[in-house]
From Swiss-Prot:
Superkingdom as given in the UniProt entry: Bacteria
Xref: InterPro entries: WzyE (IPR010691)
Membrane topology: Multi-pass membrane protein
Protein name: Probable ECA polymerase
NCBIfam families noted in UniProt: PRK02975.1
GO biological processes: enterobacterial common antigen biosynthetic process
One GO cellular component term noted in the UniProt record for this chain: plasma membrane
Subcellular location: Cell inner membrane
Transmembrane segments: 6-26, 37-57, 63-83, 118-138, 155-175, 181-201, 207-227, 228-248, 341-361, 378-398, 410-430
Annotated organism of origin: Salmonella newport (strain SL254)
Keyword field: Cell inner membrane, Cell membrane, Membrane, Transmembrane, Transmembrane helix
Pfam families: WzyE
Keyword Transmembrane helix tagged: yes
Amino acid sequence: MSLMQFSGLLVVWLLSTLFIATLTWFEFRRVRFNFNVFFSLLFLLTFFFGFPLTSVLVFRFDVGVAPPEILLQALLSAACFYGVYYVTYKTRLRKRVVDVPRKPLFTMNRVETHLTWVILMGIALVSVAIFFMHNGFLLFRLHSYSQIFSSEVSGVALKRFFYFFIPAMLVVYFLRQDSKAWLFFLVSTVAFGLLTYMIVGGTRANIIIAFAIFLFIGIIRGWISLWMLAAAGVLGIVGMFWLALKRYGLNVSGDEAFYTFLYLTRDTFSPWENLALLLQNYHNIEFQGLAPIVRDFYVFIPTWLWPGRPSIVLNSANYFTWEVLNNHSGLAISPTLIGSLVVMGGALFIPLGAIVVGMIIKWFDWLYELGNREPNRYKAAILHSFCFGAIFNMIVLAREGLDSFVSRVVFFLVVFGASLLVAKLLFWLFDSAGLIHKRTTSLPQAQVEGKL
């Protein structure tokens, strides 16, 4: 890459970043937080944060990358995607009507709410315990991260249930919403994330998500400022780099440490070059249509229920890894949101996907606002826990693609909804057995004596 080509890419990158950052800033000033703000920051991180890192790798370490015209296509496609997404998000198909009283779809009381978070926590802890009994601490047993996906590890499906510890702790926080509950959420979820990191053998998702939710709650409540958020972001990047070194068993120093930091940070937070690789091999892609979305559900179907279930799931990530990169190491490489759309339907699917994503984020914001307006604090805690708990799925959406997002959000919805139903059933059983008693508030002693 010549300096002239780099200068052209830099101009496009600056304009695109300024465009998205400006819209995000105006939205932040208007509402302080909604899921449009979160997705916009996540989109910036995924598709634009990596460009400076790539530039340093190219000019400092002479790392090979896709041709400049392909990198330009990747930047422009990301900017155009966001433009279509933003217009879709802001477009109203019907006029806003004044809220009229409607019969609520469901209600929650104190006992049901506490039962819900206990059930969610129980699902996570029992899954971790069973996985640990089968495998022990994989971080200290395995020699490479790819072994996590090998036949040496049993009960891999249980990892999907670990995440429900975070929604459980979110319910606990939203019932109190004070600084102590906020700090308790951070300590409990990060401690659980570190435990799963050691047990699973290097999975950092629970730690990243817990820390991100903690920061956004702090922004909403005004407990942290923007400069504190930026400082926490830098700390998070350094922390994730250290965990990555431990995960891959790397011992580096000097220039090698700087080089490793650059490419691991890029691959962790901003795999935008994967989109460029897909565009570079565009003519070799056999468009998969909507099949990757259907195939991604296969992993949730146990083999005893479907004995003939394919052992290899060809979703967009695996198609990109195996067919485009010809990589059969056992790891699935993230194609990114736009990359998954390219795999499914080529360039035509990019604006269509942007429209779909705009509607998805709009739905989450509607649910979030519903929780903000809800007078029943127990129901509001459940709604907010569901919305913030889905942040993991939005990260999957930006990094892994639309197919992975759909399957995971449906799975999250089913498990979360089932926990609600079980909590309501248990409450009904306890109430029928006469075990539920209404709380009575006793008068202060002075008032009691005055009434005697």
